[in-house]
């Protein structure tokens, strides 16, 4: 099965129509967008479609409940800036390894923004995409 996972490209199983955010968007607006589309993260992109950050429902929701944000708080204020991405031609096995960056349960990444050779966002791959792919193999 390992060899099979090495031969399946990220671009073949990723979600291509990615819901994104811009740094100037408000956190409430971004949270509503995540709830509307039933997604758990938003890659933050610049005007050239390059990934500059990421926000998650957990991060935003938790802090909204605790009143840590004002109505003026933007995605740029709260996004994670050191985003781990993966190239569209990488293998599923590489994606799995990137998602488990430290081997610690609390540090597993659930989604990876997928970029092309110009570092532009072309998709997103989730743990669910990978599980569905593996379930077809076994």
Curated annotation (Swiss-Prot):
Respond yes or no to whether keyword Cell cycle is given for this record: no
Q: Which UniProt keywords apply?
A: CBS domain, Repeat
Q: Which residues are in coiled coils?
A: none
Provide the CBS domain boundaries.
Answer: 14-70, 79-138
Superkingdom, natural source: Archaea
Entry keyword Repeat:
yes
What InterPro entries is this protein classified in?
CBS_dom (IPR000644), CBS_dom_sf (IPR046342), CBS_domain-containing (IPR051462)
Its recorded name reads: Uncharacterized protein MJ0922
- Report the source organism: Methanocaldococcus jannaschii (strain ATCC 43067 / DSM 2661 / JAL-1 / JCM 10045 / NBRC 100440) (Methanococcus jannaschii)
